[in-house]
Curated annotation (Swiss-Prot):
A GO term from the CC aspect: cytoplasm
Principal location: cytoplasm
Pathway(s): Metabolic intermediate biosynthesis; chorismate biosynthesis; chorismate from D-erythrose 4-phosphate and phosphoenolpyruvate: step 6/7
Record's protein name: 3-phosphoshikimate 1-carboxyvinyltransferase
Lineage, highest ranks first: Bacteria, Pseudomonadati, Pseudomonadota, Betaproteobacteria, Burkholderiales
Amino acid sequence: MDYLDLGPYSSASGTVRLPGSKSISNRVLLLAALAEGETTITNLLDSDDTRVMLDALGKLGVRLTRDADTCVVAGTRGAFTARTADLFLGNAGTAVRPLTAALAVNGGDYRVHGVPRMHERPIGDLVDGLRQIGAQIDYEQNEGFPPLRIKPAAITVDAPIRVRGDVSSQFLTALLMTLPLVKAKDGKIVVEVDGELISKPYIDITIRLMERFGVTVERDGWQRFVVPAGVRYRSPGRIMVEGDASSASYFLAAGALGGGPLRVEGVGRASIQGDVGFANALMQMGANVSMGDDWIEVRGIGHDHGKLDPIDMDFNLIPDAAMTIAVAALFASGTSTLRNIASWRVKETDRIAAMATELRKLGAVVEEGPDYLVVTPPQRLTPNATIDTYDDHRMAMCFSLVSLGGVPVRINDPKCVGKTFPDYFDRFAALAKA
């Protein structure tokens, strides 16, 4: 197995320009493909997850032109021209869920599948929602999971669509993005959410991007959404993808642990991504954080003892960035508790189990619950730990931070960061100093 040895490092400082947001990139690609007109996208993320979306759109007949700086998408005016396609979507939830919904109303015969882990990630709640409007979707293997066969169907809406919100917000995102393509008698479609909606900021991203493409969603709190029916997305002409706020979390934490100053550019106060809230969590732990419209800077920890404060926090709104807090908890002066992180269980790996296992390798005492993690840091980090990454990009990036604790660490399968941030370790090494 490939591995990468990091550290020991004693400081981290500098400036990093973030790659484009994965969540925004794949949403914008699909909206541009479904829109009327041509869209020029700048700062599109170049990663495994965006490549599978681009490949799928190409197979569906979408004309795409890409160079080093831009991606130009010729919209299909709401209907893919390819009526049959076999689509491999890797482990990209941001591609599988929205594309499944769009294909279900497109009137073709499609197969959607991915890597083995994707076939363990639930999609049943989305399929149930789509079946309520007549979609014909079959499971090839296990009920509730990909691979899927999608067949032509007569789509009709005569009642509110109900969808669970407590497993993944991507099911609701997929419905919201697709339903404008569907006709309804009174010109609108109501979606009602069962249970508490998790990861609400990601729904906010979806709604804001739909607005950029000319479609306005009304919402009543986070339980009821009204989508205009039978309308057409319109290209905004040009759209820039802001930096990835989840990826920012590793560098911001490095600025705290390594003294800084460390500035990330591409996200800030003006960001539409909820994961900029990570900066607030870091401030609660005692880090010195400042922020502009499109930058965030961290200058070490505001304590003489040099340790972060422990944190007890509900991370429902920022589950991805919360992984970075779990590793930062190794550097705290006491026990930290991460609550409401059940969605970790159905991500690229079971992140609660994986995080607990790897933190223990570094000497931490960890209590693992169904939707929480309690981390008590060791007196001293265990040097030369070998961290398994479970083919999960965020596990690899999070645990790079251990090297700032003055101990070397080995990261197995470092190339898994290709899912969202292919040159992460080069960027990290340029900022970390022995």
